[in-house]
A protein has these predicted regions:
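Nucleic-acid-processing active sites and adjacent nucleic-acid-binding tracks
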Residues: 76-111
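Active-site palm subdomain of RNA-directed nucleic acid polymerases
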Residues: 218-230, 234, 555, 559-580, ...
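Conserved "right-hand" nucleotidyltransferase catalytic core of DNA-directed polymerases
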Residues: 1-87, 153, 173, 177-384, ...
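Conserved catalytic core of nucleic-acid polymerases
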Residues: 186-187, 243, 349, 356-357, ...
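Metal-dependent phosphoesterase core characteristic of DEDDh/y 3'-5' exonuclease domains
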Residues: 116-169, 237
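A common structural junction motif
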Residues: 495, 602-610
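Catalytic palm active-site di-aspartate
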Residues: 134, 234-243, 406, 470, ...
Length: 628
C-alpha cells in the first residue's frame, strides 16, 4: 500500500502533505554535546543499526583521495522514530565520537553510496565494519537500467516526494545552495540549515524504509543472495582499491608525453609530405577536402558539414593511400596525449603520488565493474604507444605486481550454460578452443589449421558471445558479408548447443521480459517488444550476451571478495589495486609474492564450480606494461 495512503495524505492540502511530524521527529544535536551524542550512540548500539547519511561538500583544495569534506551526519533511530541532525564543524570531534560505532562489527550500517563513505571515513582513520545495506546498490540489483539518485529511489519505492516534505521547492533550494558562502543574514542561514535538516532526515527515514521494502523485493526475484553475499561485501573491496590507488611515476609520464609530442611532430610532417601541402589535420573539414578532393579518394559518407572522416571510413580507405595509416596513427597519439598524459597528470594525488580511481558497481547493465576519474580500464593496448603508457604504473620500492588473468572465462561460461558438447569437450581436454572451432567449421584436421584460420574462428567464438552479425564479422576478418554469413551458419550447425541456447534465451526474454545470470542478476530487456527492427536486434544481442558476460562478472566479484578476505586472513603485505575485465592485479611485498600467486590462483579458479574448470594464469612484474 502506498505510504501516502498509509499516512492519510492523499487528497489533503499541500501544507498537510509536507508535514514531517506524521512520519518522524527531528532533533538537532551539537557535535560537542557529549552527553546527548553518547545517548544517541547507546541507542544505536541497542538497535544494532546505524542508519545514516553524510552531507559532503566539494573542496578542490583538499589533498584527500576524495576531494570532499563531511559537513553533517544525520542518523535515524527506529525505536523512537527520530532523526538526529548533527552539524560537523570539527572533523576530529566527529571521528573521536563516532569511530567505535562505525567500526563495530555488531552494528549494521545502512546508507547510500557507501563506497564513497568507506574511502572518506578510512582517510579519517575509521575502518568501517559491517556494511549491510546500500540503497543505491539495492536499486541497481532490482533494475540495472534505471537511475539511482536517492530521492528518485525514495519516490519510486516509497512514493514519497522529498520536495513535498520541505518548505521550499527545488528551484529555491538550489539557488540557496549556490549562495552558500555569500554574506547571508542569520535568519537566511537558519532557514537553509532547516531545509537541509529536513531533507537529510527524510533521507535516513527513507533508507530505513527502503531496506525493509527492497529486501522483500530482492527476495521475490531471487536476488537477495546476490545483493547480500556478492554486492554488499564488494563495497569494501572496491573502497579499498580506491583507497590503495596505483603508484604513477610522474616524471616518466611527462617524458612519455614528450615522446608522444615528438611522434606527433614526425607524423604531421609525413602527412604534409604525402598530401603535398600543410593543413590543420585536426579539422575534419580541411582533412575531408584534402582526402576526397585533392587526393581523389572514394567518398563513402557525407555529412551536413562536409565529408565524413571518422575511423570507420578511414579504415576502409587504408589500402587506397599511404597517408591514411599515418592519419589513424596521428589520431591515436593525439588521444593518448590528451586523455592519458594530460588527462592522468591532474589525478596524481600530491600526498600519496598515486592515482585513486573510483570503481563503480552500479553502472553497467551486465554487472561488470567500471572505473572513472580516471578510467584505467580502457587504456589502449593495441597500439605500441598505448602499451608503453602502462610502464609509468609501478609498484612501490620493494614491492611487485602480481597479475592474474582468467583464461577465456566468457567462453567457458558459454560452454557451461549452453552445455554444447564440442565446446565442453575442448575445455575438458584443455584444447585450443579456436583451433577446434576452425577444424570443425572448415572440416580440416586440427594440425592443418593455419594462423589466419584460427584468427577467423577466434573472431566467431568471441563474436557469438556479443551477438555478432554477418556484417560485423565480415568487417572484422576482412571477407564478404556472404562469406561471413556462411561461416556463422556453419559454426552454429557444428555447435548446435550454442545455437539452441541463443534461440532459447531470446525466446525466454521475449516471454518473461528479462534474462538472468547464473547468480540471478536480472536484466530487463524491453527492446525486444519494440516496433523498430534495429532496437529488437539490440535486445536479442543483450539477451544472449547478458547471461554470459554477467555470469563472468559475478564470478570475478566472488573471486575478488575471496582474495581480499584471504589476504587479510593471512595478514600479508598485499593489496588489490586494479580490476580490468578478466584481470585482477595485486601489489605485494617481494617476500610474499609466491603466497599471493597461490591465493589468486586458488580463489579465482574455485570461485564457482562449472561443468569445466576455470583457468587462471598469474605473472609478476615491475610495471603494469610487463604484466602478461
Amino acid at each position: 500500500k502506498r505510504y501516502i495512503d498509509r499516512f492519510n495524505l492523499e487528497g489533503s492540502s499541500k501544507k498537510e502533505e509536507k508535514n514531517i511530524e506524521d512520519l518522524f521527529k527531528i532533533e538537532e544535536l551539537q557535535i560537542d554535546d557529549t552527553n546527548k551524542i553518547q545517548e544517541l550512540i547507546e541507542n544505536i548500539k541497542k538497535e544494532k543499526k546505524l542508519i545514516y547519511f553524510l552531507e559532503k561538500e566539494n573542496s578542490s583544495e583538499l589533498k584527500n583521495i576524495i576531494k570532499k569534506k563531511i559537513t553533517s551526519i544525520t542518523i535515524y533511530i527506529q525505536k523512537n522514530k527520530t532523526s538526529y541532525y548533527i552539524k560537523i564543524n570539527d572533523i576530529n570531534e566527529f571521528t573521536s565520537k563516532f569511530k567505535d560505532v562505525f567500526e563495530n562489527k555488531d552494528i549494521e550500517l545502512y546508507g547510500y553510496k557507501l563506497n564513497e563513505d568507506y574511502v572518506m571515513l578510512k582517510e579519517l582513520g575509521i575502518n568501517v565494519g559491517n556494511l549491510t545495506f546500500d540503497a543505491e546498490i539495492a536499486a541497481y540489483v532490482l533494475n540495472p537500467s534505471t537511475k539511482y539518485n536517492l530521492e528518485e529511489i525514495i519516490e519510486q519505492y516509497l512514493e514519497i516526494n522529498v520536495d513535498d516534505f520541505i518548505e521550499n521547492n527545488k528551484e529555491d533550494e538550489n539557488s540557496s545552495q549556490i549562495n552558500l558562502f555569500d554574506n547571508l543574514d542569520s535568519s537566511k542561514e537558519n532557514n537553509k540549515k532547516d531545509l537541509y535538516k529536513k531533507r537529510y532526515s527524510i533521507y535516513v527515514y527513507g533508507i530505513q524504509k527502503l531496506q525493509e521494502i527492497m529486501s522483500k523485493k530482492l527476495e521475490e526475484i531471487n536476488s537477495l543472495d546476490l545483493f547480500t553475499n556478492i554486492e554488499m561485501p564488494l563495497v569494501k573491496v572496491l573502497g579499498e582499491m580506491q583507497f590503495n590507488g596505483m603508484y604513477v611515476d610522474k616524471e616518466e609520464l611527462i617524458k612519455f608525453g614528450d615522446s608522444l609530442k615528438e611522434g606527433l611532430k614526425e607524423l604531421t610532417n609525413e602527412i604534409y609530405d604525402l598530401c603535398g601541402e600543410e593543413f590543420n589535420i585536426n579539422s575534419t573539414q580541411q582533412l575531408g577536402v584534402i582526402l576526397f578532393e585533392k587526393l581523389g579518394l572514394p567518398v563513402y559518407k557525407k555529412t551536413k558539414k562536409g565529408y565524413s572522416t571518422d575511423v570507420e571510413i578511414l579504415e576502409k580507405l587504408k589500402d587506397k593511400h599511404p597517408v591514411i595509416e599515418r592519419i589513424l596513427e596521428y589520431r591515436s597519439l593525439m588521444k593518448l596525449n590528451s586523455t592519458y598524459v594530460e588527462g592522468l597528470l591532474p589525478y596524481i594525488n600530491e600526498n600519496t603520488k598515486r592515482i585513486h580511481s573510483y570503481f563503480h558497481q552500479t553502472v553497467t547493465q551486465t554487472g561488470r565493474i567500471s572505473s572513472t576519474e580516471p578510467n584505467l580500464q580502457n587504456i589502449p593496448t593495441r597500439i605500441e604507444f598505448g602499451k608503453r603508457l602502462r610502464k609509468v604504473f609501478k609498484p612501490e620500492k620493494g614491492y611487485v605486481f602480481i597479475d592474474a588473468d582468467y583464461s577465456q572465462i566468457e567462453l567457458r561460461v558459454l560452454a557451461h550454460i549452453s552445455q554444447d558438447e564440442h565446446m565442453l569437450e575442448a575445455f575438458k581436454n584443455d584444447e585450443d578452443i579456436h583451433v577446434q572451432a576452425a577444424s570443425k567449421v572448415l572440416g580440416i584436421p586440427k594440425e592443418e589449421v593455419t594462423k589466419e584460420q584460427r584468427s577467423s574462428a577466434k573472431a566467431v567464438n568471441f563474436g557469438i558471445v556479443y551477438g555478432i552479425s554477418d556484417f560485423g564479422l565480415a568487417e572484422q576478418i576482412g571477407v564478404s558479408k556472404k562469406k561471413a554469413n556462411e561461416y556463422i551458419k556453419q559454426y552454429l550447425e557444428k555447435y548446435s548447443g550454442i545455437k539452441k541456447f541463443m534461440d532459447d534465451i531470446v525466446e525466454l526474454a521475449k516471454n518473461q521480459g528479462y534474462v538472468e545470470t547464473s547468480f540471478h542478476r536480472r536484466r530487463y530487456i524491453p527492446e525486444l517488444s519494440s516496433n523498430n527492427y534495429m532496437v529488437r536486434q539490440f535486445g536479442a544481442r543483450a539477451a544472449m550476451n547478458t547471461p554470459i558476460q554477467g555470469t563472468a562478472a559475478d564470478i570475478m566479484k566472488i573471486a575478488m571478495i575471496d582474495v581480499y578476505n584471504k589476504l587479510k586472513e593471512e595478514n600479508l603485505d598485499a593489496k588489490i589495486i586494479l580490476q580490468v575485465h578478466d584481470e585482477l592485479m595485486i601489489e605485494c611485498i617481494e617476500n610474499d609474492k609466491e603466497k599471493v600467486k597461490s591465493i589468486l590462483k586458488n580463489c579465482m579458479e574455485n570461485a564457482i564450480t562449472l561443468l569445466i574448470p576455470l583457468k587462471v594464469e598469474t605473472s609478476e612484474a615491475k610495471t603494469w606494461y610487463e604484466c602478461k
